[in-house]
């Protein structure tokens, strides 16, 4: 079985079909508190975002913390990248960009912080794709990985309304306990893994849904938001993300 659940053609079509990609990355961007804690505690000077096109987190870390950042992906749409950089008052000189295959690339540079957000769940061998991150990481550096949680309500929404997208994800990778164990087996320290965030659901193909489906999904979203505001718990059923952090 091939390790990758997607290919370059999938991502080319994906990015060319997306609208509104060129926005100003805000200071309160998703996971901003967690990344600020890493910066405050570990004081990284350099970071690489793997599989992160169009580089929102590389941009975030550059803009708000002054890190020397690199974007690595096996597909980079140059027109989209330039538009996103311009929207954030940056140029191609501000963010290093490497277009390459993670499975046959040997990095010439190591980084204090290696992060990926929404990458590892697109591969069948979860431990192997985590190990690929470590080739970029300096000794003592921090690994930060996030992925969506499709094992709860949001996963039901994906299966019901966008099975094609659901099947592009390795659902078995969405297990914090297993992720933590893989990291320990790979020699990482200070490993933490868990569900993250208050309730949310989304659909990549929302614009294609019927009016009834959109209204139903909005109802689910509102009920979940109210419930987690009353009882602000992070759990497998309700949290939209999983976060993994460790040091080498």
List the model feature ranges, each with a label.
Residues 118-122:
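A short His-aromatic
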């Amino acid at each position: 079985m091939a390790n990758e659940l997607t290919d370059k053609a999938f991502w080319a079509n994906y990015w060319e079909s997306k609208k509104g990609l060129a926005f100003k990355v805000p200071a309160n961007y998703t996971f901003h508190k967690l990344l600020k804690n890493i910066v405050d505690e570990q004081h990284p000077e350099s970071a690489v975002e793997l599989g992160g096109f169009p580089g929102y987190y590389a941009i975030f870390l550059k803009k708000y913390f002054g890190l020397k950042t690199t974007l690595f992906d096996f597909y980079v749409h140059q027109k989209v990248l330039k538009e996103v950089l311009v929207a954030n008052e940056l140029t191609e000189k501000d963010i290093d960009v490497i277009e390459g295959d993670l499975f046959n690339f040997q990095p010439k540079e190591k980084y204090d912080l290696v992060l990926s957000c929404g990458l590892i769940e697109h591969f069948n061998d979860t431990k192997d794709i985590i190990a690929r991150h470590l080739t970029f990481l300096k000794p003592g550096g921090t690994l930060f990985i996030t992925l969506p949680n499709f094992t709860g309500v949001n996963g039901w929404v994906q299966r019901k309304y966008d099975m094609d997208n659901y099947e592009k994800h390795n659902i078995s990778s969405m297990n914090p306990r297993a992720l933590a164990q893989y990291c320990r087996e790979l020699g990482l320290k200070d490993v933490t893994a868990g569900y993250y965030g208050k309730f949310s659901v989304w659909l990549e193909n929302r614009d294609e849904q019927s009016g009834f489906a959109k209204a139903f999904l909005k109802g689910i979203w509102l009920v979940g938001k109210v419930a987690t505001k009353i009882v602000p718990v992070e759990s497998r059923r309700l949290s939209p993300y999983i976060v993994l952090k460790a040091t080498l």
